[in-house]
Every structure is written in structure tokens, then in C-alpha cells.
Regions:
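N-terminal juxtadomain amphipathic helix
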Residues: 1-86, 247
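A SAM-dependent methyltransferase catalytic signature shared across enzymes that methylate proteins
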Residues: 10-17, 229-246
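Short, glycine-/aromatic-enriched active-site segment of Class I SAM-dependent methyltransferases
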Residues: 27, 202-225, 229-232, 236
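Extended interfacial segments that mediate partner engagement and assembly in macromolecular machines
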Residues: 40-47, 56-142, 220, 294-302
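Conserved SAM-binding strand-loop segment of SAM-dependent methyltransferases
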Residues: 145-161
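A conserved beta-strand element that flanks and buttresses the S-adenosyl-L-methionine
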Residues: 172
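A short glycine-rich, Lys/Arg-flanked "PGG" loop and its adjoining helix->strand segment in the class I
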Residues: 184-199
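Flexible, glycine-/basic-rich loop-and-beta segments that form/coincide
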Residues: 252-299
Length: 302
């Protein structure tokens, strides 16, 4: 089922302005292979719009696709495996190391949403309870004895039945949050699962980097939202969460690593991390991301 979105996925603003129309495209996350469920052959529109802060004082500025599709269709024949690339294996190990450094944890419960082939989770010491959540056929094939794989989307009733509230010390979701049709609900469910001093680390492609690099080939129908800091902060506020750090990374042409915790947890607050957040806010303000200017320039160059 193809759904035409009539409002912003974060703040509900109905004033959506077109950024660019890239025409109809086939699913990018699937390949035709013998003996494997063939992907849908029907293309879908790839139109990008933005929530306009100029038109409504509560607008968040999110950039998003105008359409979305059933995730069962997107992931029925998903091909990408994290462990194929040494670069990605090193990157995911670095994320785990950072999470352990921040929390100081020697044991506990860790969740990886969009766990794929379990590459990230394998980096945790054996003292941790490891849970992966992923709807893909790749996740369904994993057989690690010390990793519980829940082969479904997040959030879901199945996850709720299997994971207790306030039990997760570290949650990661790498390169998946931009695929989520209801990011506010997703964040609220993360909050429900996080322990009192738990942290959520996620990495997403950075919209400003895409604009700067003219990377229109990164605009695919799997990625239904394109994030910068302003709409992400709006999401966290709605969910009772907050940023305690943010860092730019070179992943896939430019991304941001986001560090989140409960809004009333000040365990990880320090001057350097606050400055990182401020620096990105200044950079986005100076890029006029809340105006038509960068989007008109982008469209004309494409």
C-alpha cells in the first residue's frame, strides 16, 4: 500500500513545500536472485518535501518523502549485510566501545535495533545480555547463541512482550532511524525501554551534508526522512528525551552520531558535549535550513 503523507511526520504541520521531485524509482534495497522472493516491480514516486517553519511557529523543519510504503515490501528481499565491509565492522566496534566508555558498564542489557547480521552486537563482552531487533530476512538467518534476535519491526507488540520496561542500558539504531515512518512513536518506545541512566545512540545520514555534496543519488525511497538537528530535537522533546552529545561522521558521505538519554538524566552532561550541540546548531542556522534558499539552490544544481 502506497501512502501519501499529508502532514509532517514529526510535528503534524500540513504546510509541506516541495524540495525536489526525482520521479518514479524502483526499490533500492532489493535485488532479483534465483530462489529468493522477488522484490516488487512497481516503482514508487520519490518526491521530497519540507515542513516549513516560515508558515507555522511550531513547525519543526523536517525534510521527508511525500510517500511511504509497507515495510514488509521494503525488507522482504533485503540484501545489505554490515559484516561484509571491514570499514563498517570497525565503525560498529567503535560505536560499542564509545557506548561502554560513556556508561562505564561492565554488564547489562543492550539492544540493537536494525541489528542486521549481528555485527554490532558481537562486539559486546559476554557479560551483557544482547538482543537484536530487525524485520529482515538477513536477521532471521542469524544463529549466534548469545544473541536473541527478535525478527520484527520496532516498535511492535512482539517487542513489548519480550522486553521489560526500563531494562535497557544501551540502545543502538545505526542507519535505520531515517527509515521510520513514525519517528516520534519510535523515540517514545525507546524511552519506555531505557533504564534510568540508559543511553540511546543512533546514526543517520545528515541532510546538510547531502545538500553540500549535492548527493541527490542518496535520496531513495527507503529513506523516508532526512534529518538535521532541529527536527531531531523536536522529536526528543516530544518523547521526554534529550541530546547530550552529537558528532558529525564521514559515514556514507556524511552523517551525524546522536547521543540521547532521559530528559531528567544529567549523568553525561559536560561542557564539551554541550559545545558540540551548539556548534551544529550554529552551522545549521548559518546554512539557512529554515528558509527556501538552500533547497532552491539544491534543486537548480540537480
Amino acid at each position: 500500500m502506497l501512502v501519501h503523507k499529508q502532514k509532517c511526520r514529526v510535528c503534524g504541520n500540513p504546510n509541506l513545500k516541495e524540495v525536489i521531485d526525482l520521479g518514479e524509482q524502483y526499490f533500492q534495497g532489493c535485488f532479483v536472485k534465483d530462489g529468493v522472493q522477488p522484490p516488487p516491480r512497481r516503482p514508487m514516486p520519490n518526491v521530497i518535501v519540507r515542513c516549513c517553519p516560515e508558515d507555522h511557529e511550531d513547525a519543526c523543519g523536517l525534510v521527508q518523502t511525500l510517500h511511504s510504503i509497507d515495510t514488509d515490501l521494503l525488507y522482504c528481499n533485503y540484501w545489505y549485510e554490515s559484516g561484509i565491509s571491514q570499514t563498517m565492522r570497525d565503525h560498529l566496534q567503535g560505536i560499542v566501545n564509545t557506548a561502554l566508555d560513556i556508561t562505564g558498564s561492565k554488564s547489562g542489557k543492550v539492544l540493537d535495533i536494525a541489528s542486521n547480521d549481528n555485527t554490532l552486537l558481537r562486539n559486546y563482552p559476554k557479560e551483557f545480555t544482547k538482543i537484536g531487533i530487525d524485520p529482515s530476512s538477513i536477521a532471521a538467518r542469524q544463529t549466534d547463541k548469545d544473541i536473541q534476535v527478535i525478527n520484527t519491526t520496532f516498535p511492535s507488540k512482539q517487542v513489548n512482550n519480550l522486553i521489560e520496561d526500563n531494562s535497557a542500558d544501551i540502545v543502538t539504531s545505526i542507519a535505520c532511524y531515517y527509515d521510520i515512518d513514525d519517528p516520534v512513536r519510535f523515540a517514545k518506545e525507546i524511552k519506555r525501554l531505557l533504564s534510568t541512566k540508559g543511553i540511546w545512540i543512533f546514526e543517520v545520514a545528515y541532510w546538510k551534508s547531502l545538500l553540500d555534496n549535492l548527493a541527490y543519488d542518496s535520496i531513495v525511497n527507503e529513506h523516508i526522512v532526512h534529518y538535521h538537528l532541529q527536527p531531531l530535537e523536536a522529536i526528543m522533546k516530544k518523547a521526554g528525551l534529550k541530546f547530550f552529545d552529537v558528532q558529525k561522521t564521514p559515514t556514507n558521505g556524511g552523517a551525524i552520531m546522536c547521543y540521547i538519554t532521559h530528559e531528567d538524566n544529567f549523568e553525561y552532561d559536560n561542557r564539551e558535549r554541550r559545545q558540540n550541540i551548539l556548534n551544529l546548531k550554529i552551522e545549521e542556522y548559518e546554512a539557512y535550513l529554515d528558509t527556501d534558499k538552500p533547497y532552491v539552490e539544491f534543486r537548480e544544481k540537480v
